[in-house]
Amino acid sequence: MSLIDKLFPKQASNDYQGNNIALYVFCLLIAMYTFRGFMHFLADDGGINSIASIIIFPFAEGAPDPNNVIYLFASLWGSAQLITLAIFYICMWRYRNLLPLLWLTVVIEVPMRMAAGTMHPLSAPYYEHVPPGAVSNLPLLAIACIMLALSLQNKKT
């Protein structure tokens, strides 16, 4: 089976042929993504202050609160994460042969997040401490690359 056929199978099924480690680690990843998605979507601050430790921005009396706009976008990001997560859960339930494609999406998404942080950098005064996402991006990218490679391997029989 070619690399293209493994990444984009002609038919989705539960017949996963890759290394089981990639499957188990993906289950751990979606557990982490579940927490992250619900936190961003449901928390009053979208996790912006409580987890990412971005400061609460001051505003003048009678002026609109800029924090509400930030919280809105955090919640919108959370909704997008939950939609992605639903696809991940469906694939783990019914279409496990799409696991290499799912790992590829993680391999693409993490550098895009890192690029967004580079294009719109926030310096130290914006944070109370280094946010978890900033610390975890590189390790997550490395793990995702390894898991993508493992998911493309054929199972040993």
Enumerate the language-model features and the residues they cover.
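N-terminal signal-anchor transmembrane alpha helix
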Residues: 17-43
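Aromatic-anchored segments of alpha-helical transmembrane domains
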Residues: 33-35, 107-117
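Core segments of alpha-helical transmembrane spans in multipass integral membrane proteins
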Residues: 51-89
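Juxtamembrane helix-break-helix junctions at the cytosolic face
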Residues: 85-100
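Juxtamembrane "helix-exit" motif on the non-cytosolic side of transmembrane helices
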Residues: 115-125
